[in-house]
Regions:
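Extracellular low-complexity Ser/Thr/Asn/Gly-rich intrinsically disordered segments
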Residues: 1-326
């Protein structure tokens, strides 16, 4: 048994005393017979050859054979005709596979390989078809190679731009314990990044009544848009905008309590139409400290040269209070 397009070579050997093959024996044969008819090409008659050898092709989707009736000859003496049967496995392909475009963190669709064969109208024995594949970019989260179908996996992209893996699948046809590589098909998996959000300013700390610095949103990934929402702790007043896109505006904020409060802007970057992928929410925090306050200090009356201690206190919490006096 050989693969489609291969050369077979048979050189009868001496097995005395039952099978004697003198050195110099030649072989001749008439045109071989294909089964099924016309399934195997490349066979032709031969005369006075040192061995039986030809290149054969199987033009069907199933195993087919070619039968040679061979006549040996040595020094003008002819031996008994004998048959040589060569089975030729077919070359089969791989059905087209759809490309996939995904976002970082998505689960891929499982890829189940298949091969469409012509009708087995001659009811010949069929072999088994298996598949092997090669992946040229393991950064997407898929191994460099494998055998059989590709199960669903989590696609990854740790860069700021799209990455693509090209996966080449090859069919393998096995019959009579002979495995023959078939045709290949290639498909791609493109994994788009989760765009990051970057802020033009560090988190801000202000005092009640102060105005924040405007903040511009950006991303190392090209072609993204931004959305943000804001949440403030109870006791914050002065917010005029509750959502936006690429700029967090200046706000004059007030803290009506005695402890620091925060205003949290949560921003999300989304890829453009080419890859509609959302990044992870990213927070930008403004801390609004309360106005410093000193509790009233009682007047004191002391005697001459008596020690005097005046302690300052505050109801403000959440930080360190210092005092100056004149």
């Amino acid at each position: 048994t050989i693969c489609d397009g291969e050369t077979f070579n048979i050189q009868p050997t001496d097995n005395s005393p039952t099978e004697i093959v003198p050195v110099g024996t030649t072989y001749s044969w008439s045109a071989p017979v294909s089964n099924p008819a016309g399934a195997v090409t490349g066979g032709s008659e031969g005369a006075s050859q040192a061995s039986i050898s030809q290149i054969l092709a199987n033009i069907t989707d199933y195993p087919a054979s070619l039968t040679y009736t061979v006549q040996s000859e040595y020094n003008g003496c002819k031996g008994e005709p004998f048959e040589v049967v060569i089975t030729v496995n077919p070359t089969v392909g791989v059905d087209a596979i759809a490309d996939q475009t995904l976002c970082n963190g998505d689960n891929t669709l499982a890829v189940n390989f298949s091969t469409t064969l012509s009708n087995n109208s001659n009811n010949v024995d069929e072999g088994e078809i298996s598949y092997s594949w090669q992946n040229d970019n393991t950064d997407i989260g898929l191994a460099a190679s494998g055998i059989g179908n590709i199960q669903s996996f989590t696609a990854t992209n740790s860069t700021t731009g799209p990455i693509t893996a090209n996966i080449t699948v090859t069919s393998v046809y096995t019959y009579n314990d002979v495995s023959c590589d078939g045709e290949s098909a290639t498909f791609s998996m493109t994994v788009n990044p989760s765009p990051l959000v970057e802020f033009s300013e560090d988190d801000q700390f202000i005092t009640s009544g102060d105005t924040t610095v405007p903040v511009t949103l950006s991303s190392p990934t090209d072609g993204v848009t931004f959305t943000w929402t804001v949440a403030a702790e109870d006791g914050i007043t002065g917010l005029t905008t509750t959502s936006g896109t690429d700029t967090i505006p200046a706000e004059t904020l007030f803290n009506t309590t005695t402890e620091p409060l925060t205003v949290t802007y949560t921003a999300i970057a989304t890829g453009d139409v080419g890859f509609d992928c959302e990044g992870l929410p990213t927070d930008y925090v403004v801390t609004v400290n309360p106005l410093a306050q000193v509790n009233p200090v009682n007047d004191q009356v002391v005697c001459n040269e008596e020690n005097l201690l005046i302690e300052f206190t505050t109801n403000i919490t959440g930080g360190t209070m210092t005092y100056t006096w004149t």
